[in-house]
Amino acid sequence: MAPLPATAIPPARFGRAMLAHFPLEAGAVYLNHGTVGVTPNVVLRARSALLDEIERHPARFMIRELMHLGLTPPPRAPRLRGAADEVARFLGVDRDGLVFVDNASAGVNAVLRSFALQPGDEILVHDHAYGGIVRAAAFIARARGATLASVALPFPVHDPADCVRALERAITPRTRIALLDHVTSETALVLPLAEMAAACRARGVAVLVDGAHAPGAIDVDIAALGVDWYAANLHKWAFAPRSCGVLWAAPDRRRDLHPGVLSWGVTSGDWLQEFDWTGTRDPSPWLAAPAALDFMRDVLGVEAMRGHNHALALESAEMLTRHWRRSWTTPQSMVGCMVTVPLPERFGTGDPATAQRLRDELLERHAIEVPVISRAGALWVRVSLQVYNEPTDLERLAGAVDALR
């Protein structure tokens, strides 16, 4: 593990004391960082300062300082590109390969809408994929006369290689593009992405990654994964303000890639210009992304933060399943900062309506925010762990579930 920066908080101080850095409601047990993130106070202040700066002279900032629209002499250092360059370094990609988008869904949609699907082609997804993305893929496939196929990945899972083998069996001669997750949303699994991407490449299938839950939660080196596109959020585990996402494309995939909203840059031949300006919008979440990276590096220490969150995730799974007398088989290599564990057997096979009722009761009666899901004939809780969480939060969750009927 790399040494902590001199200003970083010692890992022993992670836990409830860290709530001083976040604007979370007092008294709440927040075990749902993964859904939309929580922005640290210092990053919110950085964003507020950016908004103040913009409003002092909006036209000058948006037209002359934010980026080069081709309408004025280019600024020496366009602010948006400067922020994107810092994020690119964090994710291990070249500066010309990364653009900001509102969220991972926007990035995935841009790729799917730009991809040259023909009638009879196939988009391959998996059954752990985020529902909104699956619906978008189905819509685009229908519009092009293509089909959407889904591969069943194991859950519960015992071996990451089982995911690779399932994917290999699902690829057909018609498969043109596969949509893979880096970290699955409901089931909270870190997939063996490099191996799954290699299986696709060997069969001539392009790979689009939904990395919504990855940056900040696990080590991300996009260039080493061997994928064609990677869409991600920075407002979840990387502490940026909402909404802040990124999209990376391999060099040979950039020329034909276009944003969902076309504007001045569409005839420029410059994909960066196309994505950087899609019309007037609030750029402050994107420009505040470097402040979020600074918070991770200089205040928390990236490795210390991930180490705490990962260890607490494993402890959560062990403690909750022992308390509820359930089993949990996920390999440690497939765990990041979240775990999805089964609720007690007395809740039965469950259904989405029961899951929603239990989630509402946990929040309204016990001030615990945690998703409850219905899957594989059981009810589960997905527990997200961040530096402000500690074992007592899990004890409160266990006791609250015991009180549910």
Residues covered by each model-derived region:
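Pyridoxal 5′-phosphate
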Residues: 1-405
